[in-house]
Amino acid sequence: MKLLEVCVDSLASARAAKQGGADRLEFCSALAVGGLTPYADLLRQIKAELDLPVRCLMRPRAGDFLYTRDELELLCRQIETLRSAGADGFVIGALTSEGALDLPAMRTLLDACGGAPVTLHRLSLIHISEPTRRT
């Protein structure tokens, strides 16, 4: 079974995606920087108007996927907020400075998702095995 998922960052783009035949939405803000965590109020608008499943991208800032403890805590709080706002699933990714999946961070995020469907963020896949230095 094929599924058309469209990345959107506004109510207008979500409407266009539905009109174009989308089966599911990946919702984020700031597409120009690869996508950031979206706003809960906008998710509520999309869910109220459109009958499509929505997975929310969880990314606190542009740049790498190396997250501090504070950033992971923020992401967990944002996941809870977006779950309460109607998110059907989440798109996550966290890497180590060596370019491998950060399994403890991923476990923390998966636990926060509470059994909701999860997708690994495509940009984190691009950065796997590319060692990163924090500046």
Short names for language-model regions:
Residues G20-L25, L50-L52, G86-G89, C113-A116, ...:
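Glycine-enriched alpha-helix->loop->beta-strand junction motifs that scaffold or abut catalytic
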Residues I126-T135:
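Single conserved hydrophobic/aromatic residue that forms the stacking wall/gate
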Residues A87-L125:
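Hydrophobic, well-structured mid-protein blocks that either form specific transmembrane helices
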Residues L4-V6, L25-F27, V54-M58, F90-I92, ...:
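Hydrophobic faces of well-ordered beta-strands that scaffold small-molecule active sites
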Residues M1-D9, P60-L74, L120-L125:
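Active-site mouth loops of central-metabolism enzymes
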Residues A32-L50, T96-D111, S129:
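Active-site-adjacent beta->alpha loops and helix N-cap segments on the catalytic face
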Residues I46, L52-L101:
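Glycine/small-residue-rich loop that forms an oxyanion/phosphate-binding "nest" at active or ligand-binding sites
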Residues A17, L82, H121:
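Conserved, mostly hydrophobic/aromatic
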